């Protein structure tokens, strides 16, 4: 039976499904949740960041939290079955599953899981994410993991898709140098602050993606207390790597911009390993963003 908790227990104005303590990822692993506006490039960013961590010698697990289940295909070079699909095949008797049924090895040893989701208009994606973590723990698949990356659906900040924040140490927000992306980022900051009242998650910073300039992002950062951790310009090799179903680390290093992008991902991964300082950011009111951004 599902139970709810009071608003004050889970952040101001928030009523969430209470998480089973047994589903928590144990201390020791660095857990990162990647959020951002829908279509901003979170899956590409997450997969390349996972690859970068693996290049630095870390054991990495990436969990895709989108019903589209396309988070990890540049790591595995294919679309893999989702946890929810596999569970349905065994009538949700998880004891009948083997790890290889739902976890797949990708580029440079990165382990990949796609949680999937319920059919459109039904169920809760957050529940699916919770069941995925529970399944991984039941099979002792998190015990030797150094880094866990949650790639989260769009800019939805409801109780369901805020579920990864209950596991994460840090949240990274992917944005572009435009109003819509920054507006979505502001909402995500508010959601993280609500969760941070009772969970360990903290803001890690901003990843600027597909952006030649940073002026609007930096203007927002200055007002809110955020910080840009990495900057990826609109390099065509990134787009083509996704079409080739591979990470940026598998692209020809002679191609324009490839080495620069690889180094930026490696730098970001190293910053996260070095225990990045949590940020204390305050979101703006909607009207304040309208007044702040853009040109007169």
Swiss-Prot record:
Residues 1-20 are annotated as: Disordered. [4Fe-4S] cluster binds at residues 124, 158. Binds 1 [4Fe-4S] cluster per dimer. Mg(2+) binds at residue 43. It catalyses: chlorophyllide a + oxidized 2[4Fe-4S]-[ferredoxin] + 2 ADP + 2 phosphate = protochlorophyllide a + reduced 2[4Fe-4S]-[ferredoxin] + 2 ATP + 2 H2O. GO terms for molecular function: 4 iron, 4 sulfur cluster binding; ATP binding; metal ion binding; oxidoreductase activity, acting on iron-sulfur proteins as donors; oxidoreductase activity, acting on the CH-CH group of donors, iron-sulfur protein as acceptor. Its cofactor is [4Fe-4S] cluster. CDD domains: Bchl-like. Residues 1-11 have a biased composition (Basic and acidic residues). Pathway: Porphyrin-containing compound metabolism; chlorophyll biosynthesis (light-independent). Pfam families: Fer4_NifH (PF00142). ATP binds at residues 39-44, 68, 209-210. Belongs to the NifH/BchL/ChlL family. PANTHER family: LIGHT-INDEPENDENT PROTOCHLOROPHYLLIDE REDUCTASE IRON-SULFUR ATP-BINDING PROTEIN. Homodimer. Protochlorophyllide reductase is composed of three subunits; ChlL, ChlN and ChlB. This is Light-independent protochlorophyllide reductase iron-sulfur ATP-binding protein. The lineage of its organism: Bacteria, Bacillati, Cyanobacteriota, Cyanophyceae, Synechococcales.
